[in-house]
Regions:
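A structural feature that tracks compact, well-ordered secondary-structure segments
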Residues: 96-100, 109-114, 122-125
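Signal peptide processing junction and immediate N-terminal pro/mature segment
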Residues: 25-32
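Bacterial N-terminal signal peptides that target proteins for export
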Residues: 2-15
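Mid-chain, structured segments of secreted extracytoplasmic proteins
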Residues: 82-108
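Flexible coil segments in periplasmic/lumen-exposed cytochrome c-class electron-transfer proteins
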Residues: 32-41, 52, 60-90, 118, ...
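Bacterial N-terminal signal peptides
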Residues: 12-24
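An amphipathic alpha-helix signature
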Residues: 104-112, 130, 134-137
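Local sequence-structure signature of Cys/Sec-based thiol-disulfide redox active-site neighborhoods
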Residues: 47-53
Length: 172
């Protein structure tokens, strides 16, 4: 049997098209399976904790100014608004990128031992119950990785790019 170039090209195109479809079906099935294995009660608990715990106040761009009406798709993606004080200038971490690189146990360990610069209330995170930390992790993972990394820390002797809030030095 002899196949001319046109028939051979069609055969290759058909194989590629079928392969592409099979890969997309497998991806869709894996995504559906991931969603079906998520315990939505735990995710909802994490959503609640991120709201009442104040996580969004800093880690979600525009959250405070919108009175909490920022779309959830932007939640916990960090911010380029800096917090400047005697410690330097810090920026709210993109928690969705950060958490996507950790296992649940790594997140719990990190949250329990974190020591961060102001204004992050790391001591409150350290004090959270393990089941609440796990719920917060599940919620952040449910949101999925998105956004860009926050700007890097700026030492006290360097001028940060605006915008930033300036904290006064404590009284002596």
């Amino acid at each position: 049997m002899r196949i001319n170039r046109r028939q051979g090209g069609r055969s290759v195109l058909t194989v590629l098209l079928v392969s592409w479809c099979a890969v997309n079906v497998a991806i869709a099935e894996a995504s559906e399976q991931r969603l079906s294995t998520v315990d939505m009660k735990i995710v909802e608990r994490g959503r609640y904790l991120s709201k009442i715990g104040g996580c969004n106040d800093c880690h979600t761009p525009g959250y405070l100014l919108s009175e909490g009406k920022t779309p959830e798709k932007l939640w916990l993606t960090g911010d380029s608004f800096g917090w400047r004080g005697p410690w330097g200038t810090t920026y709210p971490t993109n928690l969705r990128l950060f958490v996507s690189s950790l296992t649940e146990d790594q997140w719990v360990s990190t949250a329990k031992s974190l020591k961060a610069r102001p204004p992050m209330p790391w001591f409150n995170l350290n004090a959270m119950e393990e089941n609440d930390l796990r719920a917060l992790y599940q919620f952040i993972r449910y949101l999925g990785p998105d956004g860009a990394p926050a700007p890097a820390y700026v030492p006290p002797d360097k001028e940060p790019n605006p915008p930033y809030a300036l904290f006064p030095s404590p009284p002596q």
